Amino acid sequence: MMPFRPSRRALLAAAPLLALPLGSGRAIAAGSDFNSFLAGLRRDALAQGIRPGTVDLAFRYIQFLPKVIELDQRQPDHVLTFAEFITKVVNPQRIEDARRNAGENWGLLQRVHQRYGVQPRFIVALWGVESDFGKTQGSYSVPAALATLAYEGRRGPMFRGELMSALKILDQGHIRADGMLGSWAGAMGQCQFMPSTFLSYAVDFDGDGRRDIWKDRADVFGSIANYLARLGWRGNESWGREVAVPGNFDTRLSGLESRRPLGDWMRLGVRSVGAPLTGREAADASLLLPDGLGGRALLVFDNFRATMRWNKSVKFAASVGMIADGIERG
């Protein structure tokens, strides 16, 4: 996954760019330097054993995308506080949508849970945060976006590797080149996997021979659960709780690096917002103050850390947990 950017989906909605073959009259003409760069990419792909036919077809959809560079370099006008972000993302409509989607897919979610040990509510919550339950997957040609970022982006070598991974996905027949669409940064499908993440963690849950995270919900849910399980998810635990801390709380005790038993936190004056804290929830927890003392506070467990291995953002991980809680209360 790419680092979480709260405005990413808004940017995608405001500036969609459909994949077009280079032969199209609407295609952006690439300069000679970019064409030379593509020749090197082609050699690399063939050297890695990707079939020439796959490379030829994929490169028909590769063009330089100036908008991708603009988005990569854009600085947000306003970085949302934790409280602002949670209010925006964990809203009543998203909770309602999450409950409805959980109910509509409950049988499939239970089968995924039995195989991977990840609770259905967390699968649905992650699906909702990543792609609004599959509705916002991005409309950029992934090969074109990755080639553009490899050529002129801030992390060229990384994106070059991601492009090679994307070509391997095409070579394995999981998706057609004209259907490999995603975000401007190359995150794909309903779970927004980068190509390298796809190769490592996407699964063919329904056994049809393809790992289809674009249209097949069985593969989407299975891939989300497999990834979380591989990241250390504990199926008998939750993610954390929103809590209240006293006004004189020592903030030096907060942070993911500080772990204490729940009893210790309670003796320090930490209190749950909602149901009381119990020793059943987890052996150790960390206290987070994303907006500082006086803002919202979280007591988080190991599953929160697993979610942050998916995406290194406290806001992201907390939103997943809170939406999952909303499903459970439904």
Tell where the protein language model's regions lie, with residue ranges.
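N-terminal export signals
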Residues: 2-5, 10-29
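An acidic, Gly/Ser/Thr/Pro-rich helix-cap/linker signature
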Residues: 30-104, 113
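A contiguous strand-loop segment
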Residues: 37, 44-47, 52-61, 157-181, ...
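Non-transmembrane alpha-helical segments in soluble domains
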Residues: 42, 167, 225-229, 321
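Surface-exposed patches in mature extracellular/periplasmic domains of secreted proteins
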Residues: 50-59, 119-125, 178-181, 211, ...
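Acidic/His-rich structured neighborhood in mature extracellular/periplasmic domains
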Residues: 87-216, 221-223
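Flexible, glycine-rich surface segments
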Residues: 177, 184-189, 194-277
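C-terminal soluble interaction/assembly domains
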Residues: 249-330
